[in-house]
Each structure stands twice: as C-alpha cells, then as structure tokens.
Amino acid sequence: MLENIRLSLQGIWAHKMRSFLTMLGIIIGIASILSIVSTIKGTNEQIKQNLIGAGNNVVRVQLYRTDYDYVYDIGNEGIPQGITPVDDDLYQDILDLPQVEDAALYTRRQYANPLYYGNKELSGCEVLGVDNAYFSTCRYTVDRGRTFVPADFQEFRPVAILDSDTAQLLFQGEDPIGKTIEYNGTALVVIGVVEEQNQFEPVINSLDDYYLYMSNFTAGKVFLPNAIWPSLFAYDEPQEVAVRAANTEAMSQVGTQVADLLNQQ
C-alpha cells in the first residue's frame, strides 16, 4: 500500500505539467456543472415567480369556457347560464381543504367604465366586488384610511377602496380619503387605499414575455363591498374565488381542488 502511494507521488512529480493540467480540467469540469445547475435553478425560480407572483401564494379560480382555454368574458359572450353563487356550505368546504389558509369570494369586471373625480377621468381600472375576507386573503395592507367593516355590507354603503396605483393616477398626490368619486352614475366615498404586500413585478426579457405576463394588467383596482355590486352591475358577473395556499408547492393542488368543488355545485 505504501509502495503504491510512493510510486504514484513519484509519477505525479515526474510529470508535473500533465498532472497540473489534469487537475485543472477536473476543477473546470466540476465548476461548469455547478454553474449550469445554479443557472437552471435560478431560471426555474424566476419563471415560477413570474407565473405565480412572489410570496403571496394566492390562487384565483375563475370561470373558463369549456371549448376554449380562456377566462369567460361577459362583455363579449353574454351572461353565463347555470352558474349559481357560492353558498355558505360550499365556502366552508373550501376553507376546510388541506393546505388552504384562507379564501375569499369576489366578482370582477376587468374592462370597466371610466372612473371620475371632479373633471378628472381614469379609464382601464379593474373593479371588484369583494367580501370581508378579500384583503387578508390576498395579502393587502392599508396604506391610508381603512378597509370595509360589517356595517358597510349590512347598510349597503356606497363606499370604495382604491389600490395605490388608482389613488395616484386619479388624485395626483391629493389625499383621497373622504373624497367622492363617480362610477356608473353612482357616487362613492373613498374610505381607504391599499397595497399588496408582495407586488408582482415579472422580469421582462422579450416581447413574448411582455404579452405572457402583462396582458392582464390594468391601470389599477377599485374595490367595492359586494353588497352594493348589484346596484352597479346587476348580477351578471359569476363569482370567483381567491384562495391562499400554505406554500407555493401546494398552489396547483389547491387550485384544482377548489375548481372541482365549484364544478360539482
């Protein structure tokens, strides 16, 4: 054993350059493999963050057409038939699913009419009628004012909450709290401004990335109590469900389970 080690060391010493180049090749090879693995892992993480956002683990379950793979749009396709509201029992079934931390029901109109404040007009906002669990489920924080309280729903108060983008675009730095805006001929008092804790900012490297990740972005969001939604939009929009999963890995499973429950009603 010792003789073999001695002969090996003599061979290395006698061919120092060849031994050095061999060791260098091995080191470079290992470093290249580590670099490739790190690059692939980093790319996968970036794609995952682009597709699902970073940090809030929220899955949105929406009504899709069965013949085409896109979200149902009542503006182009009319009122869907046979879609019933989510009742209390079904909502509780959603909350009881494994890996579900919270859930909220909401209605949404993506291509809404313009929003007015005085002589200012803002187009392109998304309007949502939300329940009392929406802001906690989707990880919104209050920047100014407050969120909805039970009396806002029970008394059908004409109030609205803006996200920070809408507040900035419409009020240009002016404090919006207590101000009256107009939507669909209805006066709404702004009671709060909210921000998402983990805002989705995808990395855009190409035109294809832009269309993939930015096609559904709007000028901002306006939130209304779901109790007053019928007075502005009737009952046209089907309910959607926002579900916060326990972790990123559970999002796909949670989304599928919620969709299955909704399809069974």
Please describe what each predicted stretch is:
Residues M1-I30:
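N-terminal Sec/SRP start-transfer signal
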Residues K41-E126, L169, P230-F233, E249, ...:
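Hydrophobic, regular-secondary-structure patches
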Residues L24, T107, Y183:
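Residues that line or immediately flank small-molecule/substrate-binding pockets and catalytic motifs
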Residues I28-S35, T39:
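Hydrophobic alpha-helical membrane-associated segments
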Residues A133-T147, P158-Q265:
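Mid-to-C-terminal secondary-structure elements
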Residues S8-G11, I26, Q46, N50, ...:
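Amphipathic alpha-helical segments that mediate coupling or scaffolding at interfaces
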